[in-house]
From Swiss-Prot:
Pathway: Sulfur metabolism; hydrogen sulfide biosynthesis; hydrogen sulfide from sulfite (NADPH route): step 1/1. It is an enzyme of class 1 (oxidoreductase). This is Sulfite reductase [NADPH] hemoprotein beta-component. The lineage of its organism: Bacteria, Pseudomonadati, Pseudomonadota, Gammaproteobacteria, Alteromonadales. Its cofactor is siroheme; [4Fe-4S] cluster. It comes from Shewanella pealeana (strain ATCC 700345 / ANG-SQ1). InterPro entries: CysI, NiRdtase/SiRdtase_haem-b_fer, Nit/Sulf_reduc_fer-like_dom_sf, NO2/SO3_Rdtase_4Fe4S_dom, NO2/SO3_Rdtase_4Fe4S_prot, NO2/SO3_Rdtase_4Fe4S_sf, NO2/SO3_Rdtase_FeS/sirohaem_BS. Belongs to the nitrite and sulfite reductase 4Fe-4S domain family. Keywords: 4Fe-4S, Amino-acid biosynthesis, Cysteine biosynthesis, Heme, Iron, Iron-sulfur, Metal-binding, NADP, Oxidoreductase.
């Protein structure tokens, strides 16, 4: 590979002294609310992005002021599990140190803060550290937050799967001490020439972000096939014995560039549970060594597998682990939604899944959600589990405490509102006004849009049936829109590409149906399609499957060839 061809980020990483850069100097500079251009890339590895309020951008420009810079900080919480004590600390930070005064639950089972001024970053990170929470590797060219099915019913199997998710998260952490030095005031370590600081990542880390998930069938709430690397649990009775390993998924693409495409992961085969970390490290180091470092748009693992071929990639995994894949075991991949309301686990404790619209934990008029969760955390003795559908589970509630928890939830608007199957299965990214990449609205607009879709479902007599609908402000795919039965991807303000045809279970991608259309056109298209669906559907046929069977869109079987074709 010619050095001149490397992406700019590769030089930044090489010259950063293992992710230190000049972040400390930027932190000490009060004349601007921003970091330098290079450090804006490095701070991602520390868990946050620089943003500005796009609603105020033009106004501030007219006033000859710099943009209203702030930061989005994302925590690393493997499997989305935290204690009530941790939640109270998370809540206090949101209320006292961010301008958004809210907590945003993400599509990868963690939380993030928006509207953090630069001067508050260090305080927030130190406050999180006191509660054994951090933001290391929550962003950047590293392994991101590891997802795991929260599975509030099969609690024994969940605990086993969660243990592996936690190990994967801990083992794939960067080894650099930059985070501790800059944010936690640890003494700077002096490394000697040739010392191996990052035994897995190396000096330039990965070519691009890397996402892992652990699924516990039949649930596929973690959308395992959309991840770079996924482990599908195989159980014998209540015991986890191994995983079907999948690799090569990813949602991001670029409008108008057919060389980029979303992709679902390939099935590689079955591995024993005790070999999980070996296989994860093998896949990650192959991506480190083989991944594209010249063009970041083509640097995710999915492109590496397409370029080198499935068999070649599989052979390299087996060579690096010294272990052959066994044939994949039969498992059933089912629903991607959450189980709302109360469910009793095998340990006789109860688990309450609460719907959080758009993942935004905030005190809304008539719905003081943030206060409600705070009050629950003060009395709850179990744990809080964030889901990949942006919801939260109050887990491990003894029967004696059930009425207390439910009363608090109802009192604060966390329970009592009717949630349709479609709304309960649907998610959106943050988008405007904070995300720099957003081309259109998502979180702020999505609830009202869903209400109009629900009205169409009611008109056609199938409101009781769920459709997976997802909306993002751009094609980077944070809310996994290309794996939705109805995917809406922002193209311009008020305009979206409409994608149809993904499977309800998340095992097939969707395909572009209409491009760059406004709400009225979207709803008109769905109105007509819903009428056909009700008239022509087969018994038990989901909307996504109908659109493929009836020829509304072609099935995407090989994303590299079919997604744009």
């Amino acid at each position: 590979m010619s050095e001149q061809k490397l992406a700019v980020n590769e030089y930044l990483k090489t010259d950063s002294d293992y992710l230190r850069g000049t972040i400390q100097e930027g932190l000490d500079t009060a004349v601007t609310g921003a970091f330098s251009e290079g450090d804006q890339q490095l701070i991602k590895f520390h868990g946050f992005y620089q943003q500005d309020d796009r609603d105020l951008r033009n106004e501030r420009k007219e006033q000859k002021l710099e943009p209203l810079y702030s930061f989005m900080l994302r925590a690393r919480v493997a499997g989305g599990v935290c204690s009530p004590e941790q939640w109270l600390a998370v809540d206090k930070i949101a209320s006292n140190l961010t301008s958004s005064n809210s907590i945003r639950l993400t599509t990868r089972q963690t939380f993030q803060y928006h509207g953090i001024p630069k001067r508050n970053l260090k305080t927030i990170i130190q406050d999180l550290d006191r509660e054994a929470l951090d933001s290391i590797a929550a962003c950047g060219d590293v392994n991101r937050n590891v997802m795991c099915n929260p599975n509030p019913v099969e609690s024994k199997l969940h605990q086993q799967a969660y243990a592996y998710a936690k190990q994967l998260s801990d083992n794939m952490l960067p080894h650099t001490k930059a985070y501790a030095e800059i944010w936690l005031d640890d003494e700077k370590l002096v490394t000697t020439e040739g010392e191996e600081v990052e035994p897995v990542y190396g000096k330039t880390y990965l070519p691009r972000k890397f996402k892992m998930a652990v699924a516990v069938p039949p649930d596929n709430d973690v959308d395992v096939y959309t991840n770079d690397l996924g482990f599908v649990a195989v159980a014998e009775g209540d015991e986890l014995v191994g995983f079907n390993m999948v690799a090569g998924g990813g949602m991001g693409s670029t409008h108008g560039e057919v060389s980029t495409f979303p992709r679902l992961a390939d099935d590689f085969g079955y591995i024993k549970a005790e070999d999980t970390l070996k296989f994860a490290e093998a896949v990650m180091t192959i991506q480190r060594d083989w991944g594209n470092r010249e063009n970041r748009k083509l640097s995710r693992l999915k492109y590496t597998i397409v370029k080198h071929g499935f068999e070649s990639f599989k052979a390299e995994i087996e060579a690096r682990t010294g272990i052959k894949f066994e044939p994949k075991r039969d498992v059933v991949i089912g629903d991607r939604g959450d189980r709302y309301g109360w469910k009793q686990g095998v340990d006789d404790n109860w688990h309450l899944t609460l719907f959080i619209e758009g993942g935004r934990v905030k005190d809304f008029p008539g719905q003081p959600l943030q206060t409600g969760l705070r009050e629950i955390a003060k009395v709850h003795q179990g744990d809080f589990r964030m889901t990949s559908n942006q919801n939260i589970i109050i887990a491990g509630v003894p029967s004696a405490d059930k009425a207390l928890i439910e009363g608090l939830a109802r009192q604060h608007g966390l329970l009592g509102k009717l949630i349709t199957e479609t709304r309960g299965h649907s998610i959106a990214c943050v988008a405007l006004p904070t995300c720099a990449l957003a081309m259109a609205e998502a979180e702020r607009y999505f609830p009202d849009f869903l209400t109009k879709v629900e009205a169409l479902q009611e008109k056609h007599g199938f409101l009781d049936q769920g459709i997976v609908i997802r909306m993002t402000g751009c094609p980077n795919g944070c809310a996994r829109p290309f794996a939705a039965e109805i995917g809406l991807v922002g193209k311009a303000p008020g305009r979206y590409n409409l994608y149809l045809g993904a499977s309800f279970e998340g095992t097939r991608l969707n395909k572009l149906y209409r491009e760059n259309i406004q709400e009225a056109e979207i709803l008109a298209e769905l109105d007509a399609l819903f009428a056909l669906y009700v008239a022509e559907r087969q018994a038990g046929e989901t909307f996504g499957n109908y659109t493929v069977r009836s020829g509304v869109v072609a099935a995407v079987l090989d994303a590299a060839k079919d997604f744009h074709g």
